[in-house]
Structures are given as C-alpha cells and as structure tokens.
C-alpha cells in the first residue's frame, strides 16, 4: 500500500492509448483494469473509463480520463501505471496534445482488419512530437479477416515505427494483455523531474462537479504538492487552497501528497472551468516556478451555428441547459441572438463538426429541448472600405456588398485515407469542393493517402457524409486549419414575399451561388405549406435576384353560393376575393416550418 501512496519515481509509467474509433482503445483499457484486479466482476461494464452515456453509445472518448494502476511484474516488483485516456477525434486535438504532454509513452492500437486510419496517424505524429516512446499493438487478431503482416508493413511504411516487437492481442478476449503490461514497464521510460524543485504541474483536463466545484486533473513535472497547499494558476494569476487531493484508481482515493512524475486530481473551490484551463501550469503561491510549461493556448471555436428552441416558451430551459453544458466544456461558447424568422435563440461556437453534433445531441437527450439548428458557418474575415478587418461568424452580420474590399475564408489541410478503388470518387468530390490537390501517396498496396487544401466552409457542410457515401464508409479523414485566403464570396439571401429570412442567409462562392440559390428555392417550395395568397421565394445577392419560385395560393370557391343568375354578381365576388388576397399578401406572415431549415441543412444531397 505504501508503494501505491508514495511510489518510487523510477517505478512510475505514464502512458496513453492512441487508436482510431472502434479499433479497441476503450476495450483494451477495460481489460487492463480487469487484469490488474482494479475492477471486480460485479462492477464490470464496457468502456469503464467513458463516463458519459453518449461516449459509451457512440463508442468514442470525448473527455480525457485517468486511472492509476498498481501492477506487480513477473519478478515481483511493484509499478504504478498511470493510464491517461485521450479522445481520438480531430475536433479534440488540443485536449489530445495536452494529455500526451502528461505522458512519456503511448500504446498505438491498430485494428488488424482495418489498418492505419487518418486520425490514428494524426495522433501518432502528435505523440512523436512529444518525444513519446510508442509501442505498436495489433488488435483483433482473433478475427478471421485479421492480416497481421500486412498491417505491420503498413505501420512501418506510413509511420516509420519498427514493428518487429509489435504485440499481437485480442482486447475482446484478453489475449496478450499480460504482454502489453510487461512492455509498458520494460519499454517506456520513467518520468523525469525533481520532487525538491518548485512545483510545476500541467492541467490536462478539468470538469465541473456540483459539490466540489471544478475538479482538475494534472501531471506533476517538478516539485511536490500537498493537501491544504495554496496553489497559483499561471494564465489567470488566481490562487486557491487545495481542499482535496487524490488519484483515480479507478474511483477517487484521497492522498496526502503527490510528487514529480505522478498524476492526480485536486479540488480547491474553483468556481468555473475558465479558471482552470486545459494546458495551464499549476505552481505554489509562496514558492512559484519561474516559467510556465510551454504549449498552452486558449481554445477558439471554429464552427458556429444558431440554436433555437422549436417552442419559444422553452427559451429559458435552453439557456439553463447551455449554462450547464458550458460548466463541463470550456471549448463551447454561446451568446444570445434573435432572428426575425426563429425568434430568440443562441449563437453557439464549437471546435468542429463532431463537437457540434455531440452538443446538439446532449441538449436534446439530457435536457429534452427540441432544437432548430441553422446551417453551420465558419469565421470569415472581411476587409471593409474604411480599412478595418472584421471577423464574421454569422452570414447575416456581413456588411453590404459596396462596403467590402476583400473577403477572406479559412482553408484547411486535409489528409484522406481511402482504399485505392475509391480514389476517383474522392478526387471528384474534392475538386467539386474547390480543393487544391497537394499529394497522393500509396503507403500500402490497396491504400491511398490523398492530401488536399480545401476551404473550411466546404467541409463543415456535408463533406464528411458525402465522403463516406463516395467510399462506402471506408474513408477516414483528418484536417487542420492552416490560413486565410482571399475568395470570391457573396452572401446569398432568401426572400419570402420580398422579406429576407435572416436564418436562411449563407455565404457561398460566387460560382456556386446560382446553383445553391436555385436548389434551395425549389426545396423551400416543396416544404412551405400553401397560403391563402401567393408566396414568392427569391434567392438574391444584394439587390440582384438570381432565382425565383412561386407557391400558388389556395383557392376558395367564393361563387359556390351563386346559383346561375347574373355574371356581374360572380365577378363582384371574385374581385372582392382578389382585393382580400392582395391585402393578405401585404399583411400576411409566411410561417416557416422546421422542414424549411432542414432543407437548407441538407442542400448537399442534390
């Protein structure tokens, strides 16, 4: 027990597991916990470390989790293994890079039936940038379609890792887990750092707990930390007294002190996540370290969309839900906004598309709020005639055409991994999305890595869905924003009876504006119910209408009660109806159904 509370530094191993979705990362973590008797049969459940219901259901890891594992080797020595479970998705890249900074090594888990995928590659490169020792692990060898030699060759070719010592396992059955634990102890380095130096610790995750305030996960690089110490955070300069200090093994265990190389958690009446940012440095107030740990950056949202309650009476429920979600997700931002078409709602910012999907799903699932979401948008930069540069995250905020000198849009560097038979489909899709081809590589016989530079706005819309359907679900992709470039962009407005609908405005490339406007007008014609008066649907750039559709009026037979008789009587009734319709058209409001907004979101299906 003493070894668990006060381990010898050279007997500590901090490691993370890198894997693509469904390659077996959480399953391997489960088996390690079972093999080391940390989780009893009674407590067993799949994906033990994935606390969120949504994480278990989608089979992905969204937040980093950690567990301290005491392990006795074959020769009787006790080691402490700290597993830091990282998210694998590109949207959470910064969280991954901070989690990797807290470790010295990684297990690279690859599904032998699938091979190397794009997100695996992205995270391996991150690990190698952090000077990690990487152990390749070949998973799912119990499946008949496993091709171990081919995958080994692919890893050596694409990543450059020596696979002669790669460990073959089946995380599902537990085969080979003992070899993995021995390899962690033998091949990964012990953490460096001096317990007698001033405290320097890295925050790699934090979340909000209703009873204790913010819980901070950290890794100590130098120094020692004790309960009741007063700590200071570098980026905010705020100080807190530690009220609770401990480790997860896998449930929380209180510990009086932790020192260099160890991973743990602390609570200290920290009120908001913004005060304990991922990547920040913790030190002691009275004996601080001089330099922060490098690599800290403020996370900025890159994708925006409007979220509105479908019932306006749910506005306060949605607001409370957003406040609650923000407590546990510092990367998610929101501010109130109003739309003439949708009423009161919120403009929300996300790290990427998966992040946006997860937030929307959690709002609907955990808080039972029905949402209307507007089309996602990225941040554009506008240079206006007065020489200023503005950032625009909402198409309706774009200045008038006459005031714009240049419009800049973000570009991304994208790597797409795809079986060779689908290369033609992927190239066609990327060209259609205004892509610039950079490279095509063939790391293995049947696999291709296609590299493109694409406008980010083309990706946020429907790129991923179309990529999956063009490749029968076999493609995987990884992207990062690289720079802003001048583009010939315009704002396309949709007008109903001459009135612009702000929630349907989009920024598109001028070459695509006509096709987009025409398609959307046709879709709206199908989804907006007929009214008692004619409805004109127009797509316009500034004052110029580029497409128009009309929904004809419902006709009530006002002459039904005239039996034969005078034609002037009928004409009088018809004229009266015509006048009434004119007045209605002038006064009438066209109710936009939810389907109209869905039509705008599904524009890529044409």
Swiss-Prot record:
Its EC number is 3.6.5.n1. Keywords: Cell membrane, GTP-binding, Hydrolase, Membrane, Nucleotide-binding, Protein biosynthesis. It catalyses: GTP + H2O = GDP + phosphate + H(+). GO terms for biological process: positive regulation of translation. Belongs to the TRAFAC class translation factor GTPase superfamily. Classic translation factor GTPase family. LepA subfamily. Required for accurate and efficient protein synthesis under certain stress conditions. May act as a fidelity factor of the translation reaction, by catalyzing a one-codon backward translocation of tRNAs on improperly translocated ribosomes. Back-translocation proceeds from a post-translocation (POST) complex to a pre-translocation (PRE) complex, thus giving elongation factor G a second chance to translocate the tRNAs correctly. Binds to ribosomes in a GTP-dependent manner. This is Elongation factor 4. It comes from Lawsonia intracellularis (strain PHE/MN1-00).
């Amino acid at each position: 027990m003493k070894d668990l509370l006060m381990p010898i530094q050279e007997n500590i191993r901090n490691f993370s597991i890198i894997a693509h979705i469904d390659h077996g990362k959480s399953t391997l973590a489960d088996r390690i916990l079972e093999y080391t008797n940390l989780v009893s049969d009674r407590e067993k459940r799949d994906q033990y470390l994935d606390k969120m219901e949504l994480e278990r259901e989608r089979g992905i890891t969204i937040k980093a989790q950690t567990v301290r594992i005491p392990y006795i080797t074959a020769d009787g020595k006790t080691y402490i293994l700290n597993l830091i479970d990282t998210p694998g998705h590109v949207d959470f890249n910064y969280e991954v890079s901070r989690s990797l900074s807290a470790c010295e090594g990684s297990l690279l888990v690859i599904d032998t039936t699938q091979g190397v995928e794009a997100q695996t590659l992205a995270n391996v490169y991150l690990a190698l940038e952090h000077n990690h020792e990487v152990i390749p692990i070949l998973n799912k060898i119990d499946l008949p379609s496993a091709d171990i030699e081919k995958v080994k060759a692919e890893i050596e070719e694409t990543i450059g890792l020596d696979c002669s010592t790669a460990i073959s396992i089946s995380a599902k059955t537990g085969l080979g887990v003992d070899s993995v634990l021995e390899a962690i102890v033998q091949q990964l380095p012990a953490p460096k750092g001096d317990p007698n130096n001033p405290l320097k610790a890295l925050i790699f995750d934090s979340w909000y707990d209703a009873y204790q305030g913010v819980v901070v996960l950290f890794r100590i690089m130098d120094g020692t930390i004790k309960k009741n110490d007063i700590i200071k955070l570098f980026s905010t300069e705020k100080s807190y007294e530690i009220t609770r200090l401990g480790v997860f093994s896998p449930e929380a265990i209180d510990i009086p002190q932790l020192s260099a190389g160890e991973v743990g958690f602390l609570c200290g009446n920290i009120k908001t996540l913004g005060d304990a940012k991922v990547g920040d440095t913790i030190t002691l107030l009275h004996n601080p370290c001089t330099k922060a740990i490098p690599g800290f950056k403020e996370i900025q949202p890159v994708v925006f969309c409007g979220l509105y309650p479908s019932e306006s009476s749910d506005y306060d429920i949605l607001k409370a839900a957003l406040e609650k979600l923000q407590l546990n997700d510092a990367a998610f931002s929101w501010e109130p906004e109003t739309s003439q078409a949708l009423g009161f709602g919120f403009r929300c910012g996300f790290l990427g598309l998966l992040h946006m999907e997860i937030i929307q799903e959690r709002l609907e699932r955990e808080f039972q709020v029905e949402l209307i979401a507007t089309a996602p948008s990225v941040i554009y930069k506008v240079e206006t005639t007065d020489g200023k540069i503005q950032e625009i995250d909402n198409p309706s905020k774009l200045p008038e055409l006459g005031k714009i000198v240049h419009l800049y849009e973000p570009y991304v560097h994208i790597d797409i991994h795809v079986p060779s038979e689908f290369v033609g489909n992927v190239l066609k899709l990327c060209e259609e999305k205004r892509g610039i081809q950079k490279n095509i590589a063939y790391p293995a016989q049947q696999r291709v890595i296609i590299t493109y530079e694409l406008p980010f706005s083309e990706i946020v819309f429907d790129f991923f869905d179309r990529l999956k359907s063009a490749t029968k679900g076999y493609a995987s992709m990884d992207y990062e924003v690289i720079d802003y470039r001048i583009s010939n962009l315009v704002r396309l407005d949709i007008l109903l009876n001459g009135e612009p609908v702000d929630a349907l405005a989009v920024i598109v490339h001028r070459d695509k504006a006509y096709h987009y406007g025409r398609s959307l007008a046709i879709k709206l014609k199908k989804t907006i119910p007929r009214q008692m008066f004619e409805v004109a649907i127009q797509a316009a750039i500034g004052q110029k209408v580029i497409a128009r559709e009309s929904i004809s009026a419902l006709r009530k037979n006002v002459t039904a009660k005239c039996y034969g008789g005078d034609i002037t009587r009928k004409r009088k009734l018809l004229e009266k109806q015509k006048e009434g319709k004119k007045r209605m058209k002038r006064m009438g409001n066209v109710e936009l159904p939810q389907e109209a907004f869905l039509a705008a979101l599904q524009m890529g299906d044409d």
